[in-house]
From Swiss-Prot:
Active site per database record: 99
SUPFAM superfamilies, alphabetized: RuBisCo, C-terminal domain, RuBisCO, large subunit, small (N-terminal) domain
Record keywords: Amino-acid biosynthesis, Isomerase, Magnesium, Metal-binding, Methionine biosynthesis
Record Pfam families: RuBisCO_large, RuBisCO_large_N
Cofactor list: Mg(2+)
Top enzyme class: isomerase
Name this protein carries in UniProt: 2,3-diketo-5-methylthiopentyl-1-phosphate enolase
E.C. number(s) listed in UniProt: 5.3.2.5
Superkingdom of the source species: Bacteria
Annotated metabolic or biological route of this protein: Amino-acid biosynthesis; L-methionine biosynthesis via salvage pathway; L-methionine from S-methyl-5-thio-alpha-D-ribose 1-phosphate: step 3/6
GO MF entries: 2,3-diketo-5-methylthiopentyl-1-phosphate enolase activity; magnesium ion binding; ribulose-bisphosphate carboxylase activity
Catalytic activity: 5-methylsulfanyl-2,3-dioxopentyl phosphate = 2-hydroxy-5-methylsulfanyl-3-oxopent-1-enyl phosphate
Function statement: Catalyzes the enolization of 2,3-diketo-5-methylthiopentyl-1-phosphate (DK-MTP-1-P) into 2-hydroxy-3-keto-5-methylthiopentenyl-1-phosphate (HK-MTPenyl-1-P).
Lineage of producing organism: Bacteria, Bacillati, Bacillota, Bacilli, Bacillales
Amino acid sequence: MSGIIATYLIHDDSHNLEKKAEQIALGLTIGSWTHLPHLLQEQLKQHKGNVVHVEELAEHEHTNSYLRKKVKRGIIKIEYPLLNFSPDLPAILTTTFGKLSLDGEVKLIDLTFSDELKKHFPGPKFGIDGIRNLLQVHDRPLLMSIFKGMIGRNIGYLKTQLRDQAIGGVDIVKDDEILFENALTPLTNRIVSGKEVLQSVYETYGHKTLYAVNVTGRTFDLKENAKRAVQAGADILLFNVFAYGLDVLQSLAEDDEIPVPIMAHPAVSGAYSASKLYGISSPLLLGKLLRYAGADFSLFPSPYGSVALEKEEALAISKYLTEDDVFFKKSFSVPSAGIHPGFVPFIIRDFGKDVVINAGGGIHGHPNGAQGGGKAFRTAIDATLQNKPLHEVDDINLHSALQIWGNPSHEVKL
């Protein structure tokens, strides 16, 4: 294979999956086949999409009810020749799912890239090992927290929040994805002030924290804004990838003048992936494609919290981010939303140690503030790695957190 194989979930009311698959393969490549003269068939053969797999799935009454008709469900795989498209994500997505995405009854499940095609994508600049080297933390999950309530607040408020989170033992603090360029906390001011705070905490407490700053603006201004952030001392760039496009992420990741890790936020991705019947699967969108395009971190809804993904989907995202691939470094999985210390054993059990535990309210909502919240998480992480049940840990910060949010991990065995 020199091109790409697309895997689709299809719903066919004609109940002929093979015919439907062939129609898609032709419609997204040469348009027709059987009515072409033999000579023209020979000329176009190398451009023709080829159906390589058709698998019928069990009938699903809920799907029939939603679509208001009886359909046959199936998984099909189609190979698209590399000759048909340039080796970039806009061309690949348009080839494999462009007009097909308008069907409303087809979901793009996966894309399998040939080795030849993979060579055109950067992958993460730092990856898991590179991030761990920056922090000098190699033996546990990382802990990340989020600035909360920053809109309408000034630099002084940001510095106080950042200091408390860092003292609490948080490894990475990220901007809220809805914090854009503004008069009260402009980009470079946030970075310079944040670096001063984090250096002070490091000198006093010996704990290193990185700050992920949200790089925003018009598309054609992004590179310049990212370079301004780097020049000001940015540790990590947070990026709302799906408000801009995967190719924009790749452009940032490939730029040698932007030599910092990139953290991909999933904002807007639900518009592509939320439906079980159509769109693009979350593992492909938030896992494989983000990694190929250059994300060092991928945030996605956890299976446990307030905006939960099904566990199978979340684990599939993580698999795509972390599986061995000679072409790409591994990206950090960041299962997010509604995370509190009681979920830590679940996260480590399901995602392993190479994960970023990301919390907002679970840190800021602690009765002892963000310092207490961070310490509660760090204690929960250490206890879990020692296979010690959280309710047996004698720690006031963790005990307070479990009283507020509960301890659903009481029966978890690692």
